[in-house]
């Protein structure tokens, strides 16, 4: 078994909506990013890549490459997952923590879990997504952006 950890953060800027966990969430602000700015899927992709020792999302999909401008993070997650499976890994489980003062994530979490399970080809019982605030402390608490942490457990397939 191998464990990976991922982290991502994006500042608010421009107009909404925002995309988190593949879900389009109405909000008056957008997130500044080269791709679609999906902090949840970016952190999750990093966790999975880290567990498989395949680097990180920036190495695989660099923000200096115009091909990834406005990229759909679900596509990036699926491509990373294909590479991980090619190394002989299966999924144990993933756990994602979204850190945001606003907008509220709770109503959107069930659909986030559905999308992640679809993209990883796993059961929803293998996917947990939760959200928290920082009690108005720090940049997320001041409403300057959104952060996310994720962990992933991979299992080497039997030979």
UniProtKB/Swiss-Prot annotation:
One of its GO terms (molecular function) is metal ion binding. Its EC number is 4.6.1.12. Keywords: Isoprene biosynthesis, Lyase, Metal-binding. A divalent metal cation binds at residues 8, 10, 42. Pathway: Isoprenoid biosynthesis; isopentenyl diphosphate biosynthesis via DXP pathway; isopentenyl diphosphate from 1-deoxy-D-xylulose 5-phosphate: step 4/6. InterPro entries: MECDP_synthase, MECDP_synthase_CS, MECDP_synthase_sf. 4-CDP-2-C-methyl-D-erythritol 2-phosphate binds at residues 8-10, 34-35, 56-58, 61-65, 100-106, 132-135, 139, 142. The keyword Cytoplasm does not apply. It catalyses: 4-CDP-2-C-methyl-D-erythritol 2-phosphate = 2-C-methyl-D-erythritol 2,4-cyclic diphosphate + CMP. Gene3D superfamilies: 2-C-methyl-D-erythritol 2,4-cyclodiphosphate synthase. The keyword NAD does not apply. The record marks 34, 133 as: Transition state stabilizer. Its cofactor is a divalent metal cation. Binds 1 divalent metal cation per subunit. Pfam families: YgbB (PF02542). It comes from the Bacteria. One of its GO terms (biological process) is terpenoid biosynthetic process. Involved in the biosynthesis of isopentenyl diphosphate (IPP) and dimethylallyl diphosphate (DMAPP), two major building blocks of isoprenoid compounds. Catalyzes the conversion of 4-diphosphocytidyl-2-C-methyl-D-erythritol 2-phosphate (CDP-ME2P) to 2-C-methyl-D-erythritol 2,4-cyclodiphosphate (ME-CPP) with a corresponding release of cytidine 5-monophosphate (CMP). Belongs to the IspF family. PANTHER family: 2-C-METHYL-D-ERYTHRITOL 2,4-CYCLODIPHOSPHATE SYNTHASE, CHLOROPLASTIC (PTHR43181:SF1). Homotrimer. This is 2-C-methyl-D-erythritol 2,4-cyclodiphosphate synthase. It comes from Citrobacter koseri (strain ATCC BAA-895 / CDC 4225-83 / SGSC4696). The gene is ispF.
